[in-house]
Structure formats: structure tokens, C-alpha cells
From Swiss-Prot:
Keywords: Calcium, Metal-binding, Motor protein, Muscle protein, Myosin, Repeat. GO terms for molecular function: calcium ion binding. One of its GO terms (cellular component) is myosin complex. Changing F84Y: In 20% of the molecules. Myosin is a hexamer of 2 heavy chains and 4 light chains. The lineage of its organism: Eukaryota, Metazoa, Spiralia, Lophotrochozoa, Annelida. PANTHER family: MYOSIN REGULATORY LIGHT CHAIN 2. Residues 1-17 have a biased composition (Basic and acidic residues). Coiled coil: none annotated. Residues 1-39 are annotated as: Disordered. Ca(2+) binds at D68, D70, D72, D79. This is Myosin regulatory light chain, striated muscle, 25 kDa isoform. This chain binds calcium. It comes from Lumbricus terrestris (Common earthworm). Residues 20-39 have a biased composition (Low complexity).
């Protein structure tokens, strides 16, 4: 009975440990502390690994590795085409490229997990968020004036207080009074390391 209690305590500690990012390489991640599951959307978390339990991340990693047949850490058109052939489906290479186009860059493990996180947790895609900011960018410059964004946040829709704005502004890409919403969306969707 005591051994069972010790194991339960050990498992509980693992569940409470902070998430560590799994490597983007094809090898399975080393033993890591299990992330705390969260219902928070990716754009609030900034780290897709925090959305899943460790065993779920491992399952996604195994699926990624199975698809990444050339073991280069990237799922490319050839990898995806080969998987379709293995399951007996002939798919036009153009269709495969379109499927991969949803990922703005090369589809490494982090992006692969992000796509699943968006689908499973119902968060908006990078493009959707970027387009929402672009609605306010009438001149299509890729940035908004800092004071204009602050005014929108305090007076329109869900109104934010000064402390909430200060929190957002800590990480916001602002230079010379210009809020770069393209970089901001990338930051909230992929995290700081992939700016």
C-alpha cells in the first residue's frame, strides 16, 4: 500500500511539473516532466506544449516521426505524398502542397503540434489573427500606431485596464511607436523562440 502511495505521489509531482519543449528532431524526446493540461487557447499560453499531457505529446511525436520518412525533422511534400501512397491513396502533388501551405513555414514538430492544438482547442489560426489586425491597418503597412492600439484596447469591445495593457506591452513588438502586429501574431502563436 505504501509503494502504491509513493507511486501516486510521484505521478502527481510529474503532473504538476512545468512543461518542457520537445525537440523538433525526429528522435523521441527524452524523459520529461509532464505538462499541466490546460484549456487555455494557444494564443494565451504562447507554448503549444502546455496544451497537451506528456503522453499526448509522445503520441503526436510518434505520428510526426512516422510521416517524416526521410527523418530530417520536417514534413515536406515528399513525406506526405509517401504516406498517402502507403495507405493506397493517389493524391495530386499540388493538393499535397496546398495541405502543407496551411503551415506558414516548414512543418517541423512544433508547427505540427500547433496545427493540432488549433484544431483540437478551437483557437484562431495565425492568418485569422493577422487578418483581424489588418482590418485596422487601412494603409496595409503591417503595423499600427501604439497609441491607436491602446485606444482600441481601452475603448472598444472587451475593454482592457491599464494593468492588462501593460502586461501585453511587455512582450509586444513595438519600435518607434509602431506596433508590428505581424510579429505579434507570430509571437503569440509560436512563442518567443520562433519570432
Amino acid at each position: 500500500a505504501k509503494d502504491k502511495e509513493k507511486k501516486e505521489k510521484k505521478d502527481k509531482k510529474k503532473d504538476d511539473a512545468p512543461a518542457e519543449e520537445a525537440p523538433a528532431a525526429a528522435a523521441a524526446p527524452a524523459e520529461e516532466a509532464a505538462p499541466t493540461p490546460s484549456a487555455a487557447p494557444i494564443h494565451k499560453v504562447g507554448n503549444v506544449f502546455a496544451l497537451f499531457k506528456q503522453n499526448q505529446i509522445q503520441e503526436f511525436k510518434e505520428a510526426f516521426t512516422m510521416i517524416d520518412q526521410d527523418r530530417d525533422g520536417i514534413i515536406g511534400p515528399d513525406d506526405l505524398g509517401n504516406i498517402f501512397q502507403q495507405i493506397g491513396r493517389e493524391v495530386d502533388p499540388k493538393v499535397v502542397k496546398e495541405m502543407l501551405a496551411e503551415s506558414a513555414e516548414k512543418l517541423n514538430f512544433t508547427h505540427f503540434l500547433t496545427l493540432f492544438g488549433e484544431k483540437l482547442h478551437g483557437t484562431d489560426t495565425e492568418g485569422t489573427l493577422r487578418d483581424a489586425f489588418a482590418l485596422f491597418d487601412e494603409d496595409k503597412l503591417g503595423y499600427l500606431l501604439e497609441e491607436y492600439v491602446k485606444d482600441l484596447l481601452t475603448n472598444v469591445g472587451d475593454q482592457y485596464n491599464k494593468d492588462e495593457i501593460k502586461q501585453v506591452w511587455k512582450e509586444a513588438p513595438i519600435e518607434g511607436g509602431k506596433f508590428d502586429y505581424v510579429k505579434f501574431v507570430r509571437l503569440i502563436k509560436r512563442g518567443k523562440e520562433e519570432e
